[in-house]
Amino acid sequence: MLSNARIIAAGCIAAGSLVAAGPCDIYSSGGTPCVAAHSTTRALFSAYTGPLYQVKRGSDGATTAISPLSSGVANAAAQDAFCAGTTCLITIIYDQSGRGNHLTQAPPGGFSGPESNGYDNLASAIGAPVTLNGQKAYGVFVSPGTGYRNNAASGTAKGDAAEGMYAVLDGTHYNGACCFDYGNAETNSRDTGNGHMEAIYFGDSTVWGTGSGKGPWIMADLENGLFSGSSPGNNAGDPSISYRFVTAAIKGQPNQWAIRGGNAASGSLSTFYSGARPQVSGYNPMSKEGAIILGIGGDNSNGAQGTFYEGVMTSGYPSDATENSVQANIVAARYAVAPLTSGPALTVGSSISLRATTACCTTRYIAHSGSTVNTQVVSSSSATALKQQASWTVRAGLANNACFSFESRDTSGSYIRHSNFGLVLNANDGSKLFAEDATFCTQAGINGQGSSIRSWSYPTRYFRHYNNTLYIASNGGVHVFDATAAFNDDVSFVVSGGFA
């Protein structure tokens, strides 16, 4: 009995050590150490206490670094306090490996980004809230046009050298544009030929390779192709993904590579492809360059969307056993969804009106004139038609029911949506794009009054009245309606019962 007790005790110690180890500790034990480790949600080494990411606030341009708590989970409360009463962007995602492979705002390349001088957008600091073992943290919500990069990375694989990588992603946030990637890319932000990349791709693009079903799929961006297997076409063994939290893994070595994936909240990894390199010129041997990208393609293609929580790149080709242990660690982190809304509650099915709080305009309400969404002066004595135009039925968010959509009271089936960053009233065509354009998340009013209403699909952007017309605006940016002056007031609205 004593012998059995000692065996059980030893097993508990071993299990405790495994729980304490981070993904990069596990990779190191497997002989394939992390050369880049990025996460805004948690430490990826058990002993890491440095910064996870940096945020910059809109009010004064100040920055602060967000570090892990003793649990290893990011100190989201520190971010919330720093960003109170303003907006914040994620400016740096720090590399935890010690190699300095930090990710910053991606520069222009083969494609230019939407920001000044062709840079990509930075992500909102609040677009992707989650909990890890019940503790709040924030992921990186990548809207089209958003991207991060390091073109001078240290220790990453070059040429045909072996490497592995994984990422934890939101399996419900994707599109078919190029290319939501994380991994190894060109160092000049341009397409330099077949085989010059090796990165995780997630989405439902059908331009190059595909898997089974309609997608989304985990594939590899190897440059000039998204590959689901050895063929440039279809691999029926690469399944469509439906998990809310997804673990995606890619690894490659001379004439051998693999795609693996699974549910990041439970269970184990499956192998979707393992075999020879694509039998197309340029992929055997590979010509990897060693830059690191997030949310974009190697040439800065920036039309894709997705959400990133954590990921690493390794030196050497990890064994399946090592990756399986990393997956167990991810599952033990207990990723779960967190509320996307705050502030005054809205009731689905209710009729509401939305009054401006800017000093100029406190008698003006969000209304519509045909398809144009604007502000108009409305009161209880206004004509019935105007009162109907200034009233909105709250619906569960068409793209995400944790947020809301706003249906016109006088034009049934038509909703407020954004189009080219303007707000318009359009009939619901049932498309995925419409649903995303018409989904908005409320939060306590940034100026301290009422509510601010941010776009679910572009969480840096909020309902804003500007010259009496409604836009989704960011707190500073390239558009005239992104002006910082009066931003906090212009994006805060008092919600009350609808006029009709």
UniProtKB/Swiss-Prot annotation:
Glycans are attached at residue 467. Residues 1-21 form the signal peptide. Pathway: Glycan metabolism; L-arabinan degradation. GO terms for biological process: arabinan catabolic process; L-arabinose metabolic process; pectin catabolic process. Coiled coil: none annotated. GO terms for molecular function: alpha-L-arabinofuranosidase activity. It catalyses: Hydrolysis of terminal non-reducing alpha-L-arabinofuranoside residues in alpha-L-arabinosides. Keywords: Glycoprotein, Glycosidase, Hydrolase, Signal. The keyword Hydrolase applies. InterPro entries: A-L-arabinofuranosidase_B_cat, ABFB, AbfB_ABD, AbfB_ABD_sf, ConA-like_dom_sf. It comes from the Eukaryota. Its EC number is 3.2.1.55. Transmembrane segments: none annotated. Gene3D superfamilies: 2.60.120.200, 2.80.10.50. The keyword Glycoprotein applies. Belongs to the glycosyl hydrolase 54 family. This is Alpha-L-arabinofuranosidase. It comes from Hypocrea jecorina (Trichoderma reesei).
